[in-house]
Design a protein with these regions (language model features):
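Central regulatory/effector-binding core of bacterial HTH transcription factors
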Residues: 1-32, 108-109
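Conserved glycosyltransferase catalytic-site signature
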Residues: 8, 89-93, 111-112
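Short hydrophobic/charged patches on amphipathic alpha-helices used for structural packing
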Residues: 12, 16, 36, 71, ...
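Alpha-to-beta junction loops
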Residues: 16-24, 44, 119-125
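Beta-alpha-beta core module
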Residues: 31-38, 42, 66, 113-163
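Short loop segments at secondary-structure junctions
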Residues: 49-53, 162-164
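Secondary-structure junction motif
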Residues: 56, 62-99, 166-174, 183-185
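Conserved small/polar residues in nucleotide/adenosyl-binding loops
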Residues: 189-196
Length: 197
């Protein structure tokens, strides 16, 4: 078994060329040539340096472990966005458009981890998938905020080519992924609040 990490554009081409059997991606990125098996839903979060003045404007959200910060307040800020090859970029652009955010500067990064690290260093603000947030830790504090999971949350799926019959190992891998995802997404929504991280 080979596990490969990459951007959406590369992984989609590799699946189409039969270089990959399965891909994990957002439901919104599934094409008509793919079948998809749902794994779970993750929030799409704002990330700010721990000492950023906008942190004072956050408000608690009932039922969420993340406070809400109005993205409109990001106007004038340096904002880290993913490259256009990353599926997250479409969500980031939708948020900026929906909230009429006028960034002071836009800095493009090749992955969320780098963007989050630059935010931790106080060089700007950005966005991050909740699944990344759960696994990334920095010596400098950052704050995470929900925006609106019903509009920007991402259904995560495992997909495969529609014209491929699943082999026994592929079915077994999908079942293992579903089991792991159930446990993982349960932890995302039941672990302690990062409000005071």
């Amino acid at each position: 078994m080979v596990i490969r990490e990459g951007n959406l554009a590369d992984l989609t081409i590799m699946l189409k060329n039969r270089e990959l059997d399965l891909v994990v991606l957002s439901q919104s990125d599934v094409t008509s040539e793919m079948e998809a098996v749902p794994l779970g839903m993750e929030d799409f979060l704002l990330i700010l340096p721990g000492d950023h003045p906008l942190n004072e404007k956050a408000v608690p959200v009932e039922g969420s472990k993340f406070d809400f910060l109005d993205p409109h307040l990001l106007s004038g800020e340096t904002i880290f966005l993913n490259t256009e090859m990353q599926s997250a970029r479409r969500v980031e652009e939708k948020i900026l458009k929906d909230y009429k955010v006028k960034p002071g500067r836009i800095r493009v990064v090749r992955n969320m981890e780098l963007g989050a690290q630059l935010v931790a260093e106080g060089l700007g603000v950005g966005f991050i998938r909740q699944g990344y947030q759960k696994n990334i830790h920095y010596p400098k504090p950052v704050k995470y905020y929900t925006i609106d999971i019903s509009r920007y949350g991402q259904d995560v799926v495992v997909a495969y080519r529609r014209d491929v019959e699943l082999t026994k190992p592929m079915r077994a891998m999908i079942m293992q992924m579903k089991d792991a995802a159930e446990e993982y997404f349960c932890l995302l929504y039941t672990s302690p609040s990062p409000r005071d991280a």
